[in-house]
Amino acid sequence: MGLNVVHLVGRVGGDPEVRYFESGSVKCRLTLAVNRPSKDDQPDWFNLEIWGKTAQVAADYVRKGTLLGIKGSLKFDRWQDRNTGVDRSSPIILVERMDILSSKRDTDPNAVPAGYVPEI
């Protein structure tokens, strides 16, 4: 029996990178910064990969600064470096569930409300 479950809560580091495939599949990649308990520590950065309907939700609603809660599993992308021939790998969290906990706009008092049109 094996167990590969990851739970993270953090802020998105940049707008999602979205790919649409001819098959109809949607893939979304983004980074998540998770703070450590001490204020002096730098956050840990995680690469997330999201597929399907959840990826489309991320594409439509997630932006840099959005607070997310995710549940997923750890996987490794593996490839061979074209220049050196060395085998490389990169850890990725394959997201199964994503909860949008707040947007950057929710915490920024100077942010313009959605749908705001200035009077001229």
Swiss-Prot record:
Pfam families per the UniProt record, alphabetical: SSB
Q: Which GO terms describe its biological process?
A: DNA replication
| Family matches, as Gene3D superfamilies | Nucleic acid-binding proteins (2.40.50.140)
Checking InterPro entries in the record gives: NA-bd_OB-fold (IPR012340), Primosome_PriB/ssb (IPR000424), ssDNA-bd (IPR011344)
- SSB domain span: 3-102
Q: Which GO terms describe its molecular function?
A: single-stranded DNA binding
One GO CC term on file:
nucleoid
Annotated coiled-coil segments of the chain: none
Q: Which UniProt keywords apply?
A: DNA-binding
Query: In terms of domain of life, where is this protein from?
Result: Bacteria
PANTHER family annotated for this entry?
SINGLE-STRANDED DNA-BINDING PROTEIN, SINGLE-STRANDED DNA-BINDING PROTEIN, MITOCHONDRIAL
Q: How does it assemble?
A: Homotetramer.
Supply the HAMAP family for this chain. SSB
- Which protein is depicted? Single-stranded DNA-binding protein
